[in-house]
Amino acid sequence: MHGDTPTLHEYMLDLQPETTDLYCYEQLNDSSEEEDEIDGPAGQAEPDRAHYNIVTFCCKCDSTLRLCVQSTHVDIRTLEDLLMGTLGIVCPICSQKP
């Protein structure tokens, strides 16, 4: 702006409308254990995988075992259900014993 009073042509901007994709590809956590499929711009999106540290005990000698796994959120819940049930993990020493 030049001068003491603004003029209209100084405020006229040369703006062009832009096209924007308004579809949200965000996946929300569902309270059920079913995994929903996401349709993304390139088809179906891969579920996010993360690293999980698991600390458990040997089912024979009760020594502490540490595991690091890479899994989806749904699959790690399945593993948790198995570990809380009848599935037991054996340490390397106990696995050598008959």
Swiss-Prot record:
Compartments where located: Host cytoplasm; Host nucleus
UniProt keyword Ribosomal protein, yes or no: no
Zinc finger (unnamed): 58-94
Top-level lineage group: Viruses
An example Gene Ontology biological process: symbiont-mediated perturbation of host cell cycle progression
Record motif LXCXE motif, residues: 22-26
Posttranslational mods: Highly phosphorylated.
Gene Ontology terms for molecular function: cadmium ion binding; DNA binding; DNA-binding transcription factor activity; DNA-binding transcription factor binding; protein domain specific binding; zinc ion binding
UniProt entry tagged with the keyword Cytoplasm: no
Keywords for the protein's UniProt record, in alphabetical order: Activator, DNA-binding, Early protein, G1/S host cell cycle checkpoint dysregulation by virus, Host cytoplasm, Host nucleus, Host-virus interaction, Inhibition of host innate immune response by virus, Inhibition of host interferon signaling pathway by virus, Interferon antiviral system evasion, Metal-binding, Modulation of host cell cycle by virus, Oncogene, Transcription, Transcription regulation, Viral immunoevasion, Zinc, Zinc-finger
GO CC, alphabetical: host cell cytoplasm; host cell nucleus
Cysteine disulfide partners in this protein: none
Quaternary state and interactors: Homodimer. Homooligomer. Interacts with host RB1; this interaction induces dissociation of RB1-E2F1 complex thereby disrupting RB1 activity. Interacts with host EP300; this interaction represses EP300 transcriptional activity. Forms a complex with CHD4 and HDAC1, thereby altering the action of host histone deacetylation. A similar complex involving E7, CHD4 and HDAC2 may also form. Interacts with protein E2; this interaction inhibits E7 oncogenic activity.
Protein name, as recorded: Protein E7
Source organism: Human papillomavirus type 16
Organism lineage: Viruses, Monodnaviria, Shotokuvirae, Cossaviricota, Papovaviricetes
Gene name of this polypeptide: E7
